[in-house]
């Protein structure tokens, strides 16, 4: 059974189509990055998945309709939107008490074990913690819930690089396994590239690319080309071209790397560079990627 399956998923706000006919399937044991510019439909998609907004089309999350079966669904789903959602007046111990009282699959002992690895005291109030410590507290609570699906919407927004790294390290080492699925949105794409198993690019309410990381590595190639070889490189029909330190960087889709290596240095593009090429719309050829 798919964890998430959407067919023709739509959501409109007046004349604005926040989601415009999305088809998506997410299997067990995947870490999916949902990537798009502001206003692309990322948060609306997550809200639909979490049963926080109505929708048109067909959407099943863990086999349930999230809008009509949300109470049952949320027993198997955890969500982090932003660390600021924790009340500033509450003590750490009281936060654990509260979650234990409302969520039947919360393991308080496990949350306390996670917190022993931090400098957070159980008697501290949230307002006494740094933003990074609040993120650690929130993650400890979420990881102590035995959920099959974890949804993260900009979970490290505003944190410094050290806390961001600790956040994702804890997520991978202490929570993720092949029986769980994670969906994450973030603007810090370069920091989660090595964490993801799959990516979805969304723009203007439509999905423009769905790919596993393995497929990206085999399908897309960047070539750094000197001026002398630029015409030969362009003849191979790159989908995107940019300049870097006096050299041309061309992005190719399904072009043999051996041919590209003969005219320049080759590498797999970063997710950020691929996103700019596909979603930026700066090359007419990029439209061939739209699904």
Whereabouts are the PLM-identified features?
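Walker A (P-loop) phosphate-binding loop of ABC-type ATPase nucleotide-binding domains
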Residues: 37-41
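ABC-family P-loop ATPase nucleotide-binding domains
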Residues: 81-138
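ABC transporter nucleotide-binding domain
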Residues: 166-252
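Catalytic Walker B motif of ABC-type/P-loop ATPase nucleotide-binding domains
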Residues: 150-154, 159
